[in-house]
Amino acid sequence: MKFFIFTCLLAVALAKHKMEHVSSSEEPINISQEIYKQEKNMAIHPRKEKLCTTSCEEVVRNADEEEYSIRSSSEESAEVAPEEVKITVDDKHYQKALNEINQFYQKFPQYLQYLYQGPIVLNPWDQVKRNAGPFTPTVNREQLSTSEENSKKTIDMESTEVFTKKTKLTEEEKNRLNFLKKISQYYQKFAWPQYLKTVDQHQKAMKPWTQPKTNAIPYVRYL
C-alpha cells in the first residue's frame, strides 16, 4: 500500500516537473517569435515609420507656427487699437468739414441753376420776344423831327439862293437842284405819322412792362 502511494506521488512530481519545463521552454519560443515578427515588420515597413515621424513633426511645426502668428497678430492688434482710437478722436472735426465741403460741391450746380433762373423771373424784359411780322427799325421822334426840319431848312435856303442867283447858275448847280427837288418830292410822299405809329407799336411790343394790357384796336392807315 505504501509503495503504491509513493509511486503515485512520484508520478505527480514528475508530471509537474515536465509541465514546468514545457512552459518554460514555450515562453522563450514565444518571446523569440514576437521579436522576430517585430524585426520583420521593421525590415518590411521602414518608410511608414519615417513617414509617420515626418508628418508628426510637420504637424507640430505647423501648430507652433500658428500659435506664434496668432500671438503676434494679437499683440499687433493690441498695439494698433489705441492708435486708431486716437486718430478717430482727433479727426472728427476734419471729417465733418470734408463732408460739408463735399455736400456743398454736390449742390453747387443747383445753386448756379437757381441763380440763373432768379434774374430771368425778376427781369422778364430781358427775354426778347420774336415777332412774326417784319422788323422795323427803332427811331426816336426827336431825331425824325430834327432831320425833317433840317431838310426843310436846307431846301428853303437853296431855293432862295436859286431865285436870287438865277443868272449865275451852272450845269453842276442845276443838276444839284434837280437832285434836291427829287429828294423833297420823296419826303413829301413819305407818310411820317404812319411810320412813327409803327415804330411806337414795335417799341411797346418789345417792352411789355410799359403797356401790360394790349388793346385789340384795328390799325387805321393814315393818308
From Swiss-Prot:
Q: Name one GO molecular function term.
A: zymogen binding
Q: List GO terms (cellular component aspect).
A: extracellular space
- Please give the tissue specificity annotation from the record for this chain: Mammary gland specific. Secreted in milk.
Ranges of the sequence repeats in the UniProt entry: 77-141, 159-223
According to the record, the signal peptide region is: 1-15
Q: Which UniProt keywords apply?
A: Milk protein, Phosphoprotein, Repeat, Secreted, Signal
Q: Which domain of life is it from?
A: Eukaryota
Annotated compartments: Secreted
Q: Which PROSITE patterns match?
A: CASEIN_ALPHA_BETA
Tell me, in one coarse class, where this protein mainly resides. secreted
InterPro entries assigned: Alpha-s2_casein, Casein, Casein_CS
Phosphoserine-modified residues are where?
Answer: 23-25, 72-74, 77, 145, 147, 151, 159
State the family it belongs to: Belongs to the alpha-casein family.
Function comment: Important role in the capacity of milk to transport calcium phosphate.
- Recorded protein name is Alpha-S2-casein
Species: Ovis aries
- Gene giving rise to this polypeptide: CSN1S2
